[in-house]
Design a protein with these regions (language model features):
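Thiamine diphosphate
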Residues: 1-172, 177, 189, 304, ...
Length: 322
């Protein structure tokens, strides 16, 4: 496997989410580990060119047939090998929800479904491909872990952890090439279900997931002379880190940030958790309202829906002082 030193951390950041996926899958197979790879006509986009060249017997391309992607992957997994399955996040959630529910969730198949280009990264292709409600859909299917890594280093660790976990996993990949680096030191511990505290404060907790974790960090930096913020990378949405959420109960304000609809996403999951608690913090959810997001670059769409670092900081100040 790749040595995640400072040089390779920068390398993964330059490759982006899809390139990192291809790298970790290739490294896993190169180490002679057991794995099958299935894709829905996205071999190149998934970074699997070297996999096809060096391990053709381990790669299946089902074509533009996402429902079949899930069925074939679940079938392969029945023979005992873990399976990586890839397509665009809009299609791995909305289009195949029936198959995911039956063949992954109910059957507990050892399939790791990768939703590529989740969030706003495909906004230039219009709404048919962008801002999929993937967290919301996957949260309604019992028995599936949901991972949402924030940078190249964490994608690498998350994919390895998912492969080695026996059972169905959904990984949503957000961000493009030249991803911002959140983890400059890869020696940190990545554990499914265990969130990471990136910055420690005692007044406000910013909880983010996916590539927008960097916006949360930058917002906290903008506020450093006014408010004391904790910043948390909630890389696992199912299961949530309940231990950490208990520790945050006495914070003055919790702010969840996500490139996802407010309905059914990370903020909803955390609100549902606190609904059963007698003592709970004030909580605001920053995400996409009940709208169709516009076309444009990721930065443009973030600005339009209030998720730039500056807008996050401004909203926190407004809520904290109200």
């Amino acid at each position: 496997m790749l040595n995640l030193d400072s040089k390779n951390i920068r390398f993964l950041a330059r490759m982006g989410a899809r390139g990192t996926l291809g790298q970790v899958v290739y490294d896993y197979l190169k180490d002679e580990r057991d794995l099958y790879v299935v894709t829905a006509d996205l071999m190149h986009a998934s970074g699997f060119d070297r996999v096809k060249k060096d391990f053709p017997e381990r790669l299946v391309n089902v074509g533009i047939a996402e429902q079949n992607l899930i069925g074939v992957s679940a079938g392969l997994a029945r023979y005992g090998s873990p399976v990586i399955a890839t397509s665009w996040a809009m299609f791995t959630s909305v289009r195949v929800a029936d198959q995911v529910r039956n063949y992954m969730g109910y059957m507990q198949s050892n399939v790791k479904l990768i939703g590529m280009d989740s969030g706003f990264i495909q906004s230039e292709f219009s709404y048919s491909h962008t801002n999929p409600p993937d967290i919301a859909i996957m949260r309604t299917i019992p028995g599936i872990k949901i991972l949402s890594p924030c940078d190249g280093t964490e994608i690498y660790k998350a994919v390895v952890s998912a492969i080695e976990y026996k059972g169905p996993v959904y990984i949503r990949l957000t961000g493009d090439t030249l991803m911002p680096i959140v983890y400059k030191d890869a020696t940190y511990n990545y554990e499914i279900g265990k969130a990471n505290i990136l910055k420690k404060g005692n007044e406000i907790a910013i909880i983010a997931t996916g590539n927008i974790v960097k916006n949360g960090l930058d917002a906290a930096d903008l506020l450093k002379d006014q408010l004391d913020c904790t910043v948390i990378d909630m890389h696992t949405i199912v299961p949530l880190d309940a231990t950490l959420l208990q520790e945050l109960k006495h914070y003055k304000l919790i702010v969840t940030v996500e490139e996802h609809l407010k309905a059914g996403g990370l903020g909803s999951a955390i609100a549902e958790y606190y609904a059963a608690e007698a003592v709970k913090p004030r909580h605001i959810i920053l995400g996409v309202d009940d709208i169709y997001t516009p076309s444009g670059t990721t930065g443009y769409v973030q600005e339009q829906v209030g998720l730039s670092s500056r807008q996050i900081a401004e909203r926190i100040i407004k809520e904290f002082r109200s």
